[in-house]
Amino acid sequence: MDYALKERIGKPELFTGRKEELAYFLKWINDIKDEKSMSTAILARRKMGKTAIMERLFNITFFKNDGVIPFYYEVKENKMWVVDFCQDFFFTFIYQYIAFKTRQTEYLKPEDTSDFDKLSALAKKEGLDYLTGIIAGVSHAVTYEKIDILWNMVREAPQTIAFRQKELILQMIDEFQFLNAIEIGDRQKIVKIANQSTIVD
């Protein structure tokens, strides 16, 4: 199997002893197609291989190309302004989505994750014009710091696109406990965001 997403475990053969967990989650992913799967969480102490499992699940699902589009996002441990977080989350999702639809893995590591015009142009180039509307909407919300609108648009982006295109998108949010470190408000007066983990589906 080719590996679209670089796995931090190192060489792929270093991923061992996870057959039972992989089998469980691969069945869970397959059951998404029949709407039998529900949101779930992987809970374990640090350095127990949660990230390795999710990265491997992404790669398997990406190359299996069997009706489920994978999206993997790692929440950073450092504090992040909500607008910056939303932009990073959105760009990561859209680039991964385009990579899956086009089978072009280079889009998983874009050179620029801040240029909305370039992102929109790429969507058009790849025949995914339906993405330009939501890209423009998020760009407007970022520019004018419409935080509530931005948060809702970005949080719902995978679900919105999946619904409109009659597709299935699997969201894998790694280190979601760090969502509590996201901060809102303007850059002069920052307050911690509370109870906003609804971005995890």
Each language-model region and where it sits:
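Short, N-terminal intrinsically disordered low-complexity segments that are rich in Pro/Gly
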Residues: 11-15, 144, 189
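P-loop NTPase nucleotide-binding core
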Residues: 38-40, 44-188
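Substrate-engagement module of ASCE P-loop NTPases
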Residues: 157-162, 191-201
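Walker A/P-loop-proximal flanking segment of P-loop NTPase domains
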Residues: 1-47, 52-63
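Soluble or luminal CAZymes and related metallo-dependent hydrolases
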Residues: 17-21, 146-154, 195-198
